[in-house]
UniProtKB/Swiss-Prot annotation:
The lineage of its organism: Bacteria, Bacillati, Cyanobacteriota, Cyanophyceae, Synechococcales. A divalent metal cation binds at D22, E23, D118. The gene is rnhB. It is found in: Cytoplasm. PANTHER family: RIBONUCLEASE H2 SUBUNIT A, RIBONUCLEASE HII. This is Ribonuclease HII. Residues 16-205 form the RNase H type-2 domain. It comes from the Bacteria.
Amino acid sequence: MQEKKEEDLQQALNKVSEVGIDEVGRGAIFGPVFSAVVVLTEKNKFLLKQLGVKDSKKLTPKKRKFLVPKILLLSSDYGIGQSSVREIDNLGIRVATELSMIRALKKLKEKPSELIVDGPLLLRPWRGTQKNIVSGDSKFISIASASIVAKVSRDNLMMKLEKKYSGYLIFKNKGYGTREHLSLIKKNGVTNLHRKSFLKKSNLF
């Protein structure tokens, strides 16, 4: 009887309990928008929480980098997707964000039965059950994990792009519209990776 209970407990702990998805870079003025989806069992949710997984915005860059390989190792599956600057400018940021999420989901080996999405907006192209959770990255380990993976993936790309776009301090602002970044655009001009649709609002394009 005891063995049966232990077996049932192990099965419960190893069963997929959460599939969370989040985006990063939606509000940036430079570079693509990234999304990540992470599939977790009950057991590995607990382990990741013990390792310090939480809302990526509350973690240092060093801690996020430390956690990514742990998340990828402990996830049952994961996917990363992105949408280009051209897609953002042509389709609008909402559609482009949805597209990056769908691309991340297509990387999964199996379609999840339920998806937990960070934020209030429905993922319209998704044909399946979804729950939208405001501030989900502070409430669900799967969303927090997805947020960290997406954030580090995008930040790594920004560091690589710094070599080609050295006049904009991309390594520092990560493509976001800081006062310093906007000042450098006025000085050096708009590049092919700046979001023209965003810069029009600032009268910079």
